[in-house]
Amino acid sequence: VDVIPRGKGRARHARRGNFISTYTDSKTRSYEETINLAAKQAMGASDPLEGPVDLFVYASMPVPQSYSKTRSKACLDGSERHTKKPDIDNIIKSVMDACQKVVFLNDTQVVNLHATKVYGEPYLEIMVRETECLTLR
């Protein structure tokens, strides 16, 4: 997905009379809709997976323009890793919410997770596969 990976935003709250409602902020909603659309295109006419799944997320983050040429080179060759925000767990939350009901029915189906966050051209790669069930004794 050609997006700059971002984390799941905090839930927002609005008061309407005596009621307080919770909603997702517009930037997070738009980001998740972009991922959801890409997931729908990738799935085609296939139904969502119903059993346990493995989720692989590869988030390539842009190098900040404020970095020197030396530091930018270090980021791109992998000697400096992306340890800034967004946190990798928040990236995963957005991905799982966007894929829910399209790729898999519910995010509780994810039983194996592998995520990587690096510097490079910004994009997000998502792979979901059915888990191979193993019998251990």
Each model region followed by its residue ranges:
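Acidic, proline/glycine-enriched N-terminal capping motif
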Residues: 1-137
